[in-house]
């Protein structure tokens, strides 16, 4: 399938030059300023407006029409700009509701994100009688098989469970017209790469592929050659990916132990709205949660080792505002939409700079203001400077009046 591919660059660059490459949006992409002028079906438009959307965001104005046309699309957009709705609207528009077979497959890196995509599809497709199932690990296989046998127009899921269902012949692929890879940078990272290829091999040869992410490292664009045909690119320059409207600060802590005291001092500030605290390991999340509770602070926590049911109820509590401070690993950083979150604390700086934007992109969604505070030990200074340089941004020392900025 991947034969005629637009060359992404003219010459082979040495590794260190890669960071300077800027990818522009393809010339044939036009802007459609309203949902009404996108040629969408009436029952879908009703769902869009009922969901509370009024005007399409920048990525929606550019990508939806191209996806509906059937083009393979690489779309890059900041966290919090409506990426999920971009492909959900496009998928719903392309369905034949009369045909009770899976016509679109959406892969996501985490169970939570797949579950959220399913919710958005069902909400936007509320007037269409759409059947949509989230196919995710950590849930009952029998339930998946039953739901898939019933007939689902769209399946959203994590690559491992989706491939399992295809192998068991519960998920039939013959009617699939579209494959969407959400948070593709994370998915195509080593962990999911093989599983995506496994899934892809079972899809009909003419399947349309859409790849969506906030960051597109160079290796990802190289990989798109393998399963995209003449893709249209809707990309923002990386320098614009500093999340505007988010004030970023650091707190210098000489030793690891001091981070905890600093966090306790900040607790009253955290609960002004809602806050997410990121740690790099599951053990650290458990340790910090316990330590905060021992000091009589109310916090909830989440990471990938917790049972699915528990993760869901924690998310629900946090979404409803019942819990105000969530301690998590990067499982949370990918595309989860909680609009009240206006403060992010990196208790540990992320292990790679791409994750930084996903973490702080959690706060200030849809142009809301937000604050990110990084706890920095002496040996983290270099990483912080690297992040600053990579995103052409400035991270200042935290002022005393940080509470006034939230």
From Swiss-Prot:
Q: What does the entry list under GO cellular component? A: catalytic step 2 spliceosome; cytoplasm; exon-exon junction complex; nuclear speck; nucleolus; nucleus; U2-type catalytic step 1 spliceosome
Q: Which residues bind ATP?
A: 55, 60, 77-85, 337, 362-366
**Origin superkingdom:** Eukaryota
The UniProt annotation puts motif Q motif at 33-61
Q: Per the record, what are the reactions this protein catalyses? A: ATP + H2O = ADP + phosphate + H(+)
Query: SUPFAM superfamilies per the record?
Result: P-loop containing nucleoside triphosphate hydrolases
Main subcellular location: nucleus
Tell me the InterPro entries matching this sequence. DEAD/DEAH_box_helicase_dom, Helicase_ATP-bd, Helicase_C-like, P-loop_NTPase, RNA-helicase_DEAD-box_CS, RNA_helicase_DEAD_Q_motif
The subcellular localization recorded is: Nucleus; Nucleus speckle; Cytoplasm
Q: What is its EC number?
A: 3.6.4.13
Q: Where is this motif: DEAD box?
A: 182-185
Which residue intervals define the domain Helicase ATP-binding in the entry? 64-234
Zinc recorded as keyword: no
Family statement: Belongs to the DEAD box helicase family. eIF4A subfamily.
Assembly behavior = Identified in the spliceosome C complex. Part of the mRNA splicing-dependent exon junction complex (EJC) complex; the core complex contains casc3, eif4a3, magoh and rbm8a.
Name listed for the protein in its UniProt record = Eukaryotic initiation factor 4A-III
Q: What is the lineage of its organism?
A: Eukaryota, Metazoa, Chordata, Craniata, Vertebrata
């Amino acid at each position: 399938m991947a034969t005629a591919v637009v060359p992404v660059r003219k010459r082979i660059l040495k590794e260190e030059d890669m960071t300077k490459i800027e990818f522009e949006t393809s010339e044939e992409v036009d802007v459609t300023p309203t949902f009404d002028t996108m040629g969408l079906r009436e029952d879908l438009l009703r769902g869009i407006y009922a969901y509370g959307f009024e005007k399409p965001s920048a990525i929606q104005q550019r990508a939806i029409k191209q996806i509906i046309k059937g083009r393979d699309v690489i779309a890059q957009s900041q966290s919090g700009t409506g990426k999920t709705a971009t492909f959900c609207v496009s998928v719903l528009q392309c369905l034949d509701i009369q045909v009770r077979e899976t016509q679109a497959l959406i892969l996501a890196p985490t169970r939570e994100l797949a579950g959220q995509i399913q919710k958005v599809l069902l909400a936007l497709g509320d007037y269409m009688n759409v059947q949509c199932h989230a196919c995710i690990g950590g849930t009952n296989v029998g339930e998946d098989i039953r739901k898939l046998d019933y007939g689902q127009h769209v399946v959203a899921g994590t690559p491992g469970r989706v491939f399992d269902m295809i192998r068991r012949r519960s998920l039939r692929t013959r009617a699939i017209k579209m494959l969407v890879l959400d948070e593709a940078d994370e998915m195509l990272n080593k962990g999911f790469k093989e599983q995506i290829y496994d899934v892809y091999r079972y899809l009909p040869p003419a399947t349309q592929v859409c790849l969506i992410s906030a960051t597109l490292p160079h290796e990802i664009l190289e990989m798109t050659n393998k399963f995209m045909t003449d893709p249209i690119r809707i990309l923002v320059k990386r320098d614009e990916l500093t999340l505007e409207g988010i004030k970023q600060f650091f707190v210098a802590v000489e030793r690891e132990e001091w981070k905890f005291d600093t966090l306790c001092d900040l607790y009253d500030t955290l609960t002004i709205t809602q806050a997410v605290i990121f740690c790099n390991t599951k053990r650290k999340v458990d340790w910090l949660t316990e330590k905060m509770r021992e000091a009589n602070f109310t916090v909830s926590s989440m990471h990938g080792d917790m049972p699915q049911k528990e993760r869901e109820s924690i998310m629900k509590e946090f979404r409803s505002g019942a819990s105000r401070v969530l301690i998590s690993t990067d499982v949370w950083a990918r595309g989860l939409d909680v609009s009240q979150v206006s403060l992010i604390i990196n208790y540990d700086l992320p292990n790679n700079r791409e994750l930084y934007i996903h973490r702080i992109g959690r706060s200030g969604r849809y142009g809301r203001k937000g604050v990110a505070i990084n706890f920095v030990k002496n040996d983290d200074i270099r990483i912080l400077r690297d992040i600053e340089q990579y995103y052409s941004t400035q991270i200042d020392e935290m002022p005393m009046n940080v509470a006034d900025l939230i």
